[in-house]
Amino acid sequence: VQLFTHIYQLKLIPPTGKSCIFACELPLKEIEVMKAYFIAILTLFTCIATVVRAQQMSELKNRIDSLLNGKKATVGIAVWTDKGDMLRYNDHVHFPLLSVFKFHVALAVLDKMDKQSISLDSIVSIKASQMLPNTYSPLRKKFPDQDFTITLRELMQYSISQSDNNACDILIEYAGGIKHINDYIHRLSIDSFNLSETEDGMHSSFEAVYRNWSTPSAMARLLRTADEKELFSNKELKDFLWQTMIDTETGANKLKGMLPAKTVVGHKTGSSDRNADGMKTADNDAGLVILPDGRKYYIAAFVMDSYETDEDNANIIARISRMVYDAMR
């Protein structure tokens, strides 16, 4: 007498993405054989998918090489998905973050708010002396030469979406200082970066901007960590962060520049001045991209020490962003 199991099913998803379901009724003694058979099939599909992906990334690197041929700039790229890193290009280089570090600042501020149960609508008092001149600050234009109050929600929107430098430095002080922020990000198991300067500090000398740096993969990993992990017990804080990133007004010609019009991109840009020789320290963009099928990837694109025009720098980022988008699909 043979004892039978219930219907034995296995769903296979080959690299094509189309699934197929096998169902059969088997004697118990044959189940282990069938398991081994199906595991072998799954392993084969996994190996094929891995080889295909590796070929795609190799082709992508070659296309990036061709794009950058003759360009007077150092470019770094990293792409991460929920399965890990997919692409690293010049990942050994320490790229100056510029205003991209405002994302790090926001995470530390939200961590404090979460731990102390502080509302996004809490009021912050700002002194006129905190609105420094000679720096990019839409907030100062709105409140010229006066003390004022503002919610934390609005202050963070100014810092991230509008890349306001004064708002950023106020948030750095609120979070506990730049060293505290640096230590907090390291506690998230993110290495290969350093933060030691405020926005005002970065404006103190041309060399100072290089002190806030990151490798591309460290930045992409931080984006993934902030999105996939529950860093805050209050879900509203995470939702607010990513909506603010999606609402970013700067750098529309960078990561988003050549993507389909309705593509959802939550990103933070960074840009520097030029030195006397016309060299631009950095043009950056880093963020999350959501594909039409709901899959996500995290990308950091850094352009350093560039003698190309601002338009060319943005075009480099936009074209690489589109290459990655097409490869991910």
Model-derived features: where do they sit?
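Mid-domain, small-residue-enriched loop/turn segments at the edges of structured enzyme/sensor domains
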Residues: 74, 169-229
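Beta-lactamase-like hydrolase cores
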Residues: 55-96, 273
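Short, well-structured active-site flanking segments
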Residues: 111-131, 178, 182, 234-238
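Bacterial Sec-dependent N-terminal signal peptides
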Residues: 1-8, 12-57
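Flexible glycine/proline-enriched surface loops and loop-helix/loop-strand junctions
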Residues: 89-91, 151-155, 162-168, 199-207, ...
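Structured C-terminal helix/loop/strand segments within mature extracytoplasmic catalytic/sensor domains
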Residues: 21, 56-65, 173-174, 178-179, ...
